[in-house]
Amino acid sequence: MLYYLSAERPKALQYIESKLEMEKYRSRKLKLRDVLEITPESLKNCPPQTTGDLPWHFLRKLMALNGMARSTSLEHRAPTDQTLTMDKEELDIPEDFSFLSDTDTSDSLHPLDVLCAILLSSDSFLQQEILSKMSMCQFALPLLLPALDTPKCTLLLWAMRDMVRKWRPHSLAESRGFREESLVLTSMPTISFVRMGSCSFSKSHLLNEVLSPSQQHHNFFVHWDMESGNVPRAIADGLVEISWYFPGGMGN
């Protein structure tokens, strides 16, 4: 069951937190040291098998700058040897036939729902680290979180305060100079993309095509055709994301 109406958003958040097994972080925020702590679980490199695995899968992959961090597909466990033996006998399956585990999105969650829930459950320092690592992975960053547990949207500007970028404007192309400034303090042109109503194409996919260098497609924004991108959203509607394009001084 998914919730979409504004009046139901707190219930929707509780639903997602329950699916992700993050209810305990409503009162005690998730901290950076929780993510960096080395435990037997953190040393395992297993694909997520339940929705409760998704937050830790995202955070650990992100800290390792893994481009697959946003995937929320769940892997089905292969049956145990005892179950296999029984099933093969009952179904008259040849002994050399093997069952393979597979991934599935039917029971999964939208990647942006997972991201919103994690950010709302994190303290300010972990939020800062999450956005910093997302920027390094060239993911679009969440700028405004929907009003879920607060009356107003949450602006994540503080979490971006340490981000510094270097670029070469056309005015410095001949001298091969560059500018290096904080993203938060730099004044730059802004273009907004808003989808009005229902469209037959993905706005995010179109933006990825525009922002990607020629012959180097990159998924800055999550879109329908990505793995788990077609899962219905429960809490991420209204999320405002931001990405930057920095000129390199080239003519194209």
Where are these regions (language model features)?
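Conserved beta-strand elements of beta-rich interaction domains across eukaryotes
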Residues: T150, M196-C199, G249-G251
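Extended amphipathic alpha-helical scaffold segments
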Residues: F178-D225
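Switch I (effector-binding) loop of TRAFAC-class P-loop GTPase G-domains
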Residues: L211-N252
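Beta-strand-rich binding-surface signature
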Residues: L115, A140, M188-F193, S204, ...
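N-terminal low-complexity/disordered regulatory or targeting extensions
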Residues: M1-S182, T186-T190, D225
